[in-house]
Amino acid sequence: MSESNTFSLSLELLENFEFKVDFDEYGYIITDEPPPLGNGEGPNPARLVGAAVANCLCASLLFALKKKKQWLPSMRADILGEIAKVEGFWRIVKINVEIQADTAAVDPEILNTAVQQFENFCIVTQSIRRGIPIHVELKNKTGATLLSSD
């Protein structure tokens, strides 16, 4: 039996390349492109992808440990993303995530098992690695569809 959950958020253009991304009950963030396109008033989408990957990996490691009643007192991650032109268009071509975790109090056997499993628990990383089908619809103000693509 398969399970499925959905999530939603909304995005609104404020000015230039600055957007308000509304996460409903979680509040909102402002995103922007760096100069010369935008004014750098917030993280750009590529940084959000990097943050999502690293956050999910860290949460997945915690999940794998918590299943065995283990916990990390501290953890941080550093992300280095690389963008490059691919077939004439800018793309994220690599995301390096370095996680530093205080594992001193974790049972070594449980830690070893968690290290082998945690990436499989990460929804974001595994989805990006496999490729995510994305359906795009572009509509004008009257609701007429200008583009529908997969």
Predicted stretch roles:
Residues M1-A51, L62-D150:
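Extended beta-strand/beta-hairpin segments
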